């Protein structure tokens, strides 16, 4: 580790460290990004990915009114649902609170998590998600996004290579917007080192 420590950001090392010693070397780092189909967003007056939560809701309302499905999410693979929910929790409660929950220092049973789950439920009730998504795999949802069926697709940045290879120049990646700026901020993301 001493030979390579300057090339490995400390933020990547948490998953390979135990009891003060390093037992692995992460080779990649991925985050959950909010991929946007800019061609579909332009149809409802958005030339940039919505930067605030209010803008995202406005954009989604306009997409639904135009008959465009805002989000695709695989319900068949629950980790995909988790990527949405964790992002909403983080943008509501903040990264520190979410990390405390993951580490067992705090409970899932708290007001911020309840608020985030309520926001997610409201998005479902407002028909922001493909109603057929519950029966789709992630690969099917990703293919639908690539075919222009959804305005947004939240998933890992490992998808960037596939989108570039397919020549999808209409795709732009951002992050889910902050919901509670007193607890969260841009740049606090779900994800981390892997491999």
Residue ranges of predicted features:
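Hinge/lid segment of periplasmic solute-binding proteins
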Residues: 1-33, 57, 83-84, 111-112, ...
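Short, solvent-exposed loop/beta-turn-alpha elements that line the ligand-binding surface or hinge
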Residues: 1-8, 92-115, 165, 178-189
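Extracytoplasmic "Venus flytrap"/periplasmic binding protein-like
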Residues: 1-11, 15-17, 39-51, 143-144, ...
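Extracytoplasmic/periplasmic substrate-recognition and gating elements
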Residues: 42-44, 126, 165-195
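A local structural motif
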Residues: 44-48, 121-135, 149, 166-170
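Short helix-initiation/N-cap motifs at beta->coil->alpha
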Residues: 51-57, 132-146
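Glycine-centered hinge/linker elements that transmit conformational signals in sensory
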Residues: 60-62, 102-134
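Beta->alpha turn/N-cap motifs
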Residues: 138, 155-160, 177
């Amino acid at each position: 580790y001493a030979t390579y420590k300057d090339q490995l950001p400390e933020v990547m090392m948490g998953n390979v460290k135990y009891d003060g010693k390093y037992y692995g070397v992460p080779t990649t780092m991925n985050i959950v990004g909010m991929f946007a189909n800019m061609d579909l967003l332009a149809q409802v007056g958005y030339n940039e990915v919505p930067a605030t939560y209010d803008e995202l809701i406005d954009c989604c309302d306009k997409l639904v009114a135009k008959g465009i499905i805002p989000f695709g999410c695989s319900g068949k693979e629950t980790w995909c649902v988790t990527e949405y929910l964790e992002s909403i929790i983080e943008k509501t409660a903040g990264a520190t609170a979410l990390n405390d929950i993951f580490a067992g220092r705090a409970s899932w049973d708290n007001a911020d998590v309840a608020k985030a789950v309520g926001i997610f439920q409201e998005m479902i009730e407002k028909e922001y998600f493909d109603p057929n998504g519950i029966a789709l795999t992630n690969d099917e949802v990703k293919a639908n996004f690539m075919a222009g069926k959804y305005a947004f697709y939240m998933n890992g940045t490992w998808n960037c290579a596939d989108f570039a290879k397919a020549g999808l120049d209409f795709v732009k990646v951002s992050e889910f917007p902050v919901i509670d700026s007193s607890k969260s901020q841009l740049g606090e993301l779900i994800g981390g080192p892997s491999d």
